[in-house]
Amino acid sequence: MTLELLECEELKRRLKIGKEPCDSCQPDLLPSYIEDRVPKGCLVAHIGLCLLELKSIEIVDKIIDRDLIIGAILLHDVGKLTRGYREAPTRYPHNVYSALFILEAKGLEEHKYELAISTLLHHEYYEWKKTYKHRETDMLASIPYGTTELEGARVEAFIDRVKSINEQIKMNINGVLNLLRNNANLVLKEPGRRLKGFRVTNISIIAKAIVLSYLLYLLDNRAAFFRKRKFEWLKNEFMKLTWKPEKLAEEILTNKNIEVGIRYVFLSLLPDYLKV
């Protein structure tokens, strides 16, 4: 089989393996995103790349429990395994249903709220204060999201393939995957009602959620850029620059051609830049 999925190509390159990452590639079964109603990419490869990006950030263990981030990586896109997302992604946004899964899953108690908050808000992490202050959950609660369910067969395929690629990555993932398997057919009802009552005031939980949201956004976007070769090209161009680090950081923060959220992803490359 010739690899046509850029995420799979990058995963194969990063793992330094001579075969396809999965035994059988089925993008229609496990797409990493849907564009114009067409399933695209590979969710398993995306998760694998997120885990590899985590391995590349050495400072993580000094600021937050690595297993907590691994849990966030494995669960933040669970909403993409629902029937609703596959059929109508805009009506069933994956981050909302992923957060709802975390809140409703049986067997998940420790760090439930940190994981749910970071999953719900990780796309907007760089505006977390404004988002949380203006009651993002109230806004979400006002939208008439429907009821949907995880598709058990797709969940099992996801688990099997993630386990397979993790043989090379070697992360501690079995506990989270067992949780997912035990809730493989979970029905996700009335997210608006559930989120309306979801309010966390414990400062310790909020602080962890903020850090987790930042890291999840960073890892998610660094991995997602490989879908269209965008990140690899930008990273290569980035490394060619000979500016001093402070000059480079200033350019990243002030260049109007770089989207606000993407600036943080580029700043995360500075440690690699300094090693060159």
Q: Where do the language-model regions lie?
A:
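Divalent metal-dependent catalytic cores for phosphoryl transfer on phosphate-bearing substrates
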Residues: 31-36, 59-238
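Acidic/His-rich, divalent-metal-binding segments that scaffold phosphate/diphosphate chemistry
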Residues: 1-90
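Divalent-cation-assisted or electrostatically stabilized phosphate/pyrophosphate-binding catalytic cores
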Residues: 7-10, 15, 35-42, 86-105, ...
